[in-house]
């Protein structure tokens, strides 16, 4: 491992803000495998993953990124052993409940994407409380993808557009539909 001789402040000054992405997405993958390699249970790795999210969020805010998406739980994750699913859901509830004050203090607006209706009731409730509590923050937006897949996203987009066409919110002309997708 090579270390950098420059202090963080000097590195931050070297960042070209005009070339900085506005949105960064991170797929949370490998935490369980890492834990097993270290001789721990998979859930230990997931709990350490929370620290990685904190660090990524702090760094993203510090350099001026406006949106950070964390792909935390995909629809495929329901195929894991039940004890691991339960542990992940408990970790989600615990983390959200314990981080909401810190999110507020740091100007972080929390939102979510995915089929959150498919999550356990306690997860939905804690998530919604945190979303509501941070809704007026705008330094950076943390988007948590939960019960998410690309297929779900496509189905959801088609359903939303179809409903808007039916209610005449958007015109069913080709150009109007294309603009709705962008």
Give each language-model segment a name.
Residues 1-3:
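N-terminal secretory leader/proregion of peptide precursors and effectors
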Residues 5-182:
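Flexible, compositionally biased loop and terminal segments
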């Amino acid at each position: 491992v090579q270390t950098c001789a420059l202090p963080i402040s000097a590195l931050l000054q070297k960042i070209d803000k005009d070339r900085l992405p506005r949105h960064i997405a991170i797929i949370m993958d490998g935490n369980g495998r890492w834990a097993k390699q270290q001789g721990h249970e998979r859930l230990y790795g997931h709990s350490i993953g929370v620290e990685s999210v904190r660090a990524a969020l702090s760094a993203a805010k510090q350099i001026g990124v406006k949106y950070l998406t964390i792909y935390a739980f995909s629809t495929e994750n329901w195929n894991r052993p039940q004890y691991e699913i339960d542990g992940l859901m408990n970790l989600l509830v615990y983390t959200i409940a314990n981080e909401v004050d810190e999110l507020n203090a740091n100007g972080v607006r929390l939102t979510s994407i995915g089929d959150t209706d498919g999550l356990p009731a306690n997860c939905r409730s804690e998530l919604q409380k945190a979303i509501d509590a941070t809704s007026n923050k705008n330094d950076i937006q943390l988007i948590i993808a939960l019960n998410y897949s690309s297929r779900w996203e496509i189905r959801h987009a088609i359903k939303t557009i179809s409903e808007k066409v039916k209610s005449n919110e958007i015109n069913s002309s080709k150009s109007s539909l294309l603009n709705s997708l962008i």
